[in-house]
Amino acid sequence: DKDHPIRNWTEHQREVFSVDWNNIQKELFMSCSWDGNVKIVRVYTDQWHPERPASIQTLPPHGACVYKAAWSPHDPTVLATACGDGNMRLFDTRIPAARPVATMGVGGEVLSLDWNKYRRMTLASGSSDRTVKTWDIRAQPAPAQSVLTGHTYAVRCVTWSAHQSNILATAGYDMTARIWNVDD
């Protein structure tokens, strides 16, 4: 039925900004919100009931809007968040209380992030300071691998190519979409 979703969650206290499916543990889904929370839901379960909370895990509050949360395409327990406090955080859901295993200070509100599909330890971020940064998360604290400039307003979206490990697409509030070769 096109007018009725098969599942509906109402656990967030503010607008939900982003959702993402876990590509490895296919029953896991997460949402993030302006309320600063990230909620992980096991979608396909017989215990689901519309009057009970559906989330199986809530990450510690970020203290600011979480604009984007994305599962790693390489590890089913690892995810990254892009936050309005200027930080990108990495979480391993196996760690008790799900504290961040790493925090990267990006600068400006972090509006977007994306995992590289081929380079398992590489992330890209886009932020309100008009920069795009790539990160090698093996080094902690992780310095930015590259800083791409050129957008004249905030960078709202970053997406790695599904076909080439070095190609990154970005979109900004400057009304432009750009393609970058991060190896140049």
Q: How would you name each of these model-derived features?
A:
Residues 19-26, 70-76, 114-120, 159-165:
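Loop/turn segments within WD40 beta-propeller blades
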Residues 59-91:
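Loop-centered beta-sheet repeat module
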Residues 100-184:
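Structured C-terminal portions of repeat-based eukaryotic scaffold domains
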Residues 4-9, 54-59, 99-103, 143-148:
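A short beta-strand motif characteristic of beta-propeller blades
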Residues 1, 38-44, 88-93, 113, ...:
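WD40-repeat beta-propellers
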